[in-house]
């Protein structure tokens, strides 16, 4: 849960709101640090106020278990956190090549909570979308006619059950979803899942992100909001022109692109990557971008 990325400079804590770590009544927080073959010299942590002006607690030279790929760190926080208040967790990692790498996450004390129940619900709903269980997802959708029912690139809680369960497209999930909490309160859990699927009929792959907002009660869990964004994963060398037009396939939004003066090369950004398409050579090229971190 909650993938975090390292920074080599101090960051503004108030803006580091990509994810939230919830602390249960045992005050334990487990962290797994992927080493990427780095030689790690020390690990320390701080819990600060969101504006970073006040140090709540900290610890140096943390003990860790090394399994070869990950360094596993377990924090037992002091009983200093106020329930419902947000703090900033800063994990500091010193390596042989880099003096200090910092990882940031919002931290909130939940005490007794039902976050795992909400996660289980989201995973069940997610499985229903993949297995084509239209009747199952229909129980939680709020169809109101605002969605056209044809676009698989973007669907939400107001969509019909057909598009939510991928319509006629046969999909298989690749690997496990990456889960991130974006909001944690006493009875509210908001999370995202990111994963890839394959269209098994035409062997195309798609990057998918789902967002859930859930409310737990003693009798049931309510799906308050649901969205899904799907984008075809582009591959260098693939042809994009169909009937003289660029065809990007399933996309969550229309790509923005620019042409050169001769109008024979098109550049566009898709999924954080810069691509170019040469009409003359009918060839797609990745100009700049990162994948898998």
Segments predicted by a language model, with ranges:
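Structural recognition of the beta-propeller blade-terminating site
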Residues: 49, 215, 278-280
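Acidic, serine/threonine-rich low-complexity disordered tracts
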Residues: 238-240
């Amino acid at each position: 849960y909650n993938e975090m990325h390292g920074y080599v400079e101090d960051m503004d804590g108030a803006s580091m709101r990509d994810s939230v770590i919830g602390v249960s009544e045992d005050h334990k927080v487990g962290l797994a640090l992927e080493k990427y073959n780095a030689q790690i010299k020390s690990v320390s942590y701080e819990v600060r106020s969101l504006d970073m002006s006040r140090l709540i607690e900290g610890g140096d030279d943390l003990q860790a278990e090394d399994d070869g790929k990950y360094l596993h760190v377990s924090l037992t926080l002091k009983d200093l956190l106020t329930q419902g208040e947000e703090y900033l967790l800063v994990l500091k990692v010193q390596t042989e090549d880099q003096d200090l790498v910092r990882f940031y996450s919002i931290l909130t004390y939940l005490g007794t909570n039902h976050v795992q129940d909400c996660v289980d619900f989201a995973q069940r709903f997610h499985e229903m979308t993949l297995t084509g269980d239209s009747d199952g997802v229909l129980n939680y959708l709020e169809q109101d006619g605002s969605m056209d029912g044809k676009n698989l690139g973007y669907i939400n809680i107001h969509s019909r059950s057909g598009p939510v369960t991928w319509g006629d497209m046969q999909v298989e999930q690749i690997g496990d979803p990456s889960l991130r909490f974006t909001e944690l309160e006493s009875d509210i859990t908001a999370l995202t899942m990111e994963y890839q699927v394959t269209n098994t009929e035409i062997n195309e792959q798609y990057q998918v992100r789902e967002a859930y907002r859930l409310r737990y009660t003693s009798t049931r869990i309510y799906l308050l909001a649901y969205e899904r964004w799907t984008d075809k994963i582009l591959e260098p060398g693939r042809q994009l022109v169909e009937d003289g037009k660029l065809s990007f396939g399933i996309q969550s939004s229309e790509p923005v692109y620019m042409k050169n003066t001769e109008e024979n090369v098109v550049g566009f950004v898709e999924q954080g990557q810069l691509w170019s398409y040469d009409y003359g050579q009918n060839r797609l090229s990745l100009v700049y971008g990162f994948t898998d971190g």
